[in-house]
Design a protein with these regions (language model features):
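Core catalytic alpha/beta fold that binds nucleotide/phospho-ligands
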Residues: 1-218
């Protein structure tokens, strides 16, 4: 769902997974900022870069709006797990946030979820990644930037899904293309869902039960 205004959320059903794509511009930014909590506003004051401020306002504002749809009488209390992954205390929804140059994405589900977005136009030194062996990808990953980003976004989404980010050694996680699907193996197998949209590659990783429900991608 491409979201420009919080007013677009009136019919939203959070019983199923959903992903939002937010343009990083000033359009309707006040409608997002007014939903920031006091703690959010205090953290916003610490951000100096204007683009980072827009990202913070729109993504945090959106998450707070979604929280309020189910908790109209409560204030969102943002916390971080020990690896720095944000969550809202007491909310039975899991969310994940990712940024590219001009777009941010927010994914929300009742199950664990991770999302990553990358700009297909970014410069990537495939040879360097292949030489350093920092990543545990199959050889096909280095055939083109498109193939690499399919694996890389899946890996990043998976690391957010488990709540560790790059605190987990990426070498321990195998990412392979199997029958046109991206499969992640860290001792058990999980498939990444992928969206190619408007010059971006987006990957989502969720609990297998959540896949059976189907995600609403708009």
């Amino acid at each position: 769902m491409e979201l420009t205004s919080p007013k677009d959320l009136s019919e939203l059903n959070l019983a199923e997974p959903v992903i939002f794509k937010l343009p990083m511009d000033l359009v309707n930014i006040d409608d997002f900022q007014k939903h920031l909590s006091q703690a959010n506003l205090e953290n916003l004051q610490k951000i100096k870069d204007e683009r980072e401020k827009i990202r913070f306002i729109k993504t945090r504002g959106l998450v707070n709006i979604l929280f309020s749809l189910e908790n109209s009488e409560a204030d969102p209390i943002w916390q971080l797990n020990k690896y720095g992954k944000p969550y809202i205390a007491g909310w039975d929804k899991n969310f994940s946030i990712s940024h590219s140059t001009d777009i941010s994405v927010v994914a929300v589900a009742s199950e664990a979820i991770g999302v990553d977005i990358e700009d297909n136009g970014r410069d990537i030194d495939l040879g360097k990644f292949k030489r350093t062996k920092f990543l545990n990808f199959d050889e096909g990953a280095y055939e083109s930037k498109e193939e690499f980003l399919m694996r890389f976004t899946a890996l990043e989404a998976y690391l957010k899904y488990i709540g560790k980010g790059f605190h987990e050694d990426a070498k321990n996680i195998s990412v392979r293309k199997v029958n046109d699907a991206i499969v992640i193996d860290d001792g058990s197998l999980i498939k990444a869902e992928m969206i190619k949209n408007g010059g971006y590659t987006i990957s989502i990783v969720m609990n297998k039960k959540a896949y059976l429900k189907g995600a609403n991608y708009g």
